[in-house]
């Protein structure tokens, strides 16, 4: 039996991409899974696909009341909450400082930080009492942009660096009751969109990046799928497998940190 059997897991942005892969994986692990999802169509799809195995709540991660409504439903359904996974986010399609108009930069900043940073903070606030009670955990999705430049423009990169600070501070404030960690995936097949303020709300990440382009920059030389990143979340959520980690960011970057100066990888001819 899985360590996560009957554990109550709350994931934001579970309707597509990494969020959907996390929903699938935690259901496979036997967990009771809930998600807060902005898209009504994706909520309907989740309910149709997973039936009684999913509690799908339509709502916005920038709205505390929506979080509270979701947590109330989770506690009614499961009687507890063991892990909150803040995952919903938006990207800026590498919008640069020089090429972004000042007024767009300002509105884009507020929209992107509201989702990527405030959304995590509001989720933590809504989930904290239940997680303190269960001595559970929080996990936040980061990005390779939390470590390196070039994984987005200045707005996205700054938001992911801000999220690392949030993780450390929450890990400090909530210890010893709640473990707080992060996972930073690299580029993957995803429906990740951009801010409406930048005119990117209908543009997905795969319209800006090709599988070949992503694979070429990774030392492991493959195009990651969302399911490739779910393992670290499962480990961090498990009390048996993670008793000791808090304030830790797992850099799941397919080897970006070890790219060579002369070659992406030294073993390409092996």
From Swiss-Prot:
The keyword Cell inner membrane does not apply. It catalyses: 3-(cis-5,6-dihydroxycyclohexa-1,3-dien-1-yl)propanoate + NAD(+) = 3-(2,3-dihydroxyphenyl)propanoate + NADH + H(+); (2E)-3-(cis-5,6-dihydroxycyclohexa-1,3-dien-1-yl)prop-2-enoate + NAD(+) = (2E)-3-(2,3-dihydroxyphenyl)prop-2-enoate + NADH + H(+). Pathway: Aromatic compound metabolism; 3-phenylpropanoate degradation. InterPro entries: BphB-like_SDR, Dihydrodiol_DH_HcaB, NAD(P)-bd_dom_sf, Sc_DH/Rdtase_CS, SDR_fam. Substrate binds at residue 143. One of its GO terms (biological process) is 3-phenylpropionate catabolic process. NAD(+) binds at residues 10-34. Its EC number is 1.3.1.87. It comes from Escherichia coli O8 (strain IAI1). The active site is at 156 (proton acceptor). Converts 3-phenylpropionate-dihydrodiol (PP-dihydrodiol) and cinnamic acid-dihydrodiol (CI-dihydrodiol) into 3-(2,3-dihydroxylphenyl)propanoic acid (DHPP) and 2,3-dihydroxicinnamic acid (DHCI), respectively. SUPFAM superfamilies: NAD(P)-binding Rossmann-fold domains. Belongs to the short-chain dehydrogenases/reductases (SDR) family. One of its GO terms (molecular function) is 2,3-dihydroxy-2,3-dihydro-phenylpropionate dehydrogenase activity. NCBIfam families: 3PPDhyd_Dh_HcaB, PRK06200.1. It comes from the Bacteria. Keywords: Aromatic hydrocarbons catabolism, NAD, Oxidoreductase. This is 3-phenylpropionate-dihydrodiol/cinnamic acid-dihydrodiol dehydrogenase. The keyword Protein biosynthesis does not apply. It holds the Pfam family adh_short.
């Amino acid at each position: 039996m899985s360590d996560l059997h009957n554990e109550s897991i709350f994931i934001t942005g579970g309707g597509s991409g990494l969020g959907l892969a996390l929903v699938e994986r935690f259901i496979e692990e036997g967990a009771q899974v809930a998600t807060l999802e902005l898209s009504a169509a994706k909520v309907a799809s989740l309910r149709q696909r997973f039936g009684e195995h999913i509690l799908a709540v339509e709502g916005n991660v920038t709205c505390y009341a929506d979080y509270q409504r979701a947590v109330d439903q989770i506690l009614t359904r499961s009687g507890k909450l063991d892990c909150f996974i803040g995952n919903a986010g938006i990207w800026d399609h590498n919008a640069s400082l020089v090429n972004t108009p000042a007024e767009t930069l300002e509105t884009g900043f507020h929209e992107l930080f509201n989702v990527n940073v405030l959304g995590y903070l509001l989720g933590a606030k809504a989930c904290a009492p239940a997680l303190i009670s269960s001595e559970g955990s929080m996990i936040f999705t980061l990005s390779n942009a939390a470590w390196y430049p070039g994984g987005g423009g200045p707005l996205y990169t700054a938001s992911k660096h801000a999220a690392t600070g949030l993780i450390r501070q929450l890990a400090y404030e909530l210890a010893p009751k709640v473990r707080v960690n992060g996972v930073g995936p690299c580029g993957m097949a995803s429906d990740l969109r951009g801010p409406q303020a930048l005119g990117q709300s209908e543009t997905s990440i795969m319209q800006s990046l090709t599988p070949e382009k992503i694979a070429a920059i990774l030392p492991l030389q493959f195009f990651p799928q969302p399911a490739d990143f779910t393992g670290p979340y499962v480990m961090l959520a498990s009390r048996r497998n993670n008793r000791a980690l808090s304030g830790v960011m797992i850099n799941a970057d397919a080897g970006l940190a070890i790219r060579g100066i002369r070659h992406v990888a030294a073993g390409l001819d092996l």
